[in-house]
Curated annotation (Swiss-Prot):
Organism (species): Nitratidesulfovibrio vulgaris (strain DP4) (Desulfovibrio vulgaris)
Residues that bind (6S)-5,6,7,8-tetrahydrofolate: 116-119
PANTHER family: METHIONYL-TRNA FORMYLTRANSFERASE, METHIONYL-TRNA FORMYLTRANSFERASE, MITOCHONDRIAL
Any Gene Ontology CC annotation: cytosol
Presence of keyword Thylakoid: no
Catalytic activity: L-methionyl-tRNA(fMet) + (6R)-10-formyltetrahydrofolate = N-formyl-L-methionyl-tRNA(fMet) + (6S)-5,6,7,8-tetrahydrofolate + H(+)
EC number: 2.1.2.9
Tree of life domain: Bacteria
CDD domains: FMT_core_Met-tRNA-FMT_N (cd08646), Met_tRNA_FMT_C (cd08704)
GO MF annotation terms: methionyl-tRNA formyltransferase activity
Keyword Protein biosynthesis: yes
Swiss-Prot/TrEMBL keywords: Protein biosynthesis, Transferase
Family per similarity comment: Belongs to the Fmt family.
Official protein name in the record: Methionyl-tRNA formyltransferase
Gene symbol of the encoding locus: fmt
Amino acid sequence: MAESAPLKIVFMGTPDFAAASLRHLLAWDGCDVVGVYTQPDRPCGRGQQCRPSAVKMLALEHGLDVRQPVNFRDEADVQALRDFGADILVVAAYGLILPQSVLDAAPMGAVNVHGSLLPRYRGAAPIQRAVMNGDAVTGITIMQVVKQLDAGPMLLQKALGIGCDETSGQLHDQLAELGGRLLVETLARLRAGTIMPIPQDDALATYAAKLTKADGLVDWNRTAVEVHAQVRGVTPWPAAYFTLRREGQKDVRVTIEPGTIGPLLEQPAVPGTIVGLVDGAIAFACADRTYLVRTIRPADKKPMTGEAFWCGYLSRCEGECPGFAVCEGA
């Protein structure tokens, strides 16, 4: 292909992370987005109303042809993809494992925008798992799509530091933008023939499993640093939670926003015990020191400060108030 010819692209993606890549493609004069594939509209939220994906909304704003097959088992759907005549497919958080017939639908194959430094964190939740594991660095990988999950040869990578108080939601937004920029750079170099795929080392591969609500259950038996990483990693979803049990009173299911690592425990305390109020924050005992929570939300209530929660829910406790995590209601 001549370097001056725009790449004809079919884009495949669904959530906000993918929409950032599509936005960068639409702003680049080196390509022509001829079609967009995204997941079918699905019920979401408390009202369970069907809502279009972020990618669909952006595509429609730009008058693009949007397709939403449930899968590609029907040959007619595969043929419809071929009929776009794309040079290459671009995939970003699409939500479907693509069959070989789809990968073969464009002469240059398919490339994917992945939110980690592969081969680390293959799978559905690379951003959240990196934060939950306390990693200091993550990044974006643009790689060729093969049948095996996230295992294709790498085209470009770029690292990004993870702040010690950064949540997965905040990191997601940074990586989404980085992914869009790196995608355009990758496609420009593919178009010019100046990029060489690098095989992944499967021996170094790790897997980032999709998060469930159970991942938000705070494990106070960990160190405060590990608890902080867990809470940051599950923010905004599924959110960090536990059940506070008070002797002679009703259990309280609460969620918390990321706090700060507090001082070492002055004396041994059962992990999960509330050991005091420190500068307006509730101090929870961890394995080694305290974790200070400044924003807490009881079930079916609005978020409140740690001090307000202390006064409203713990004022009848004498001394230490026992609180520990349970899975019920996850």
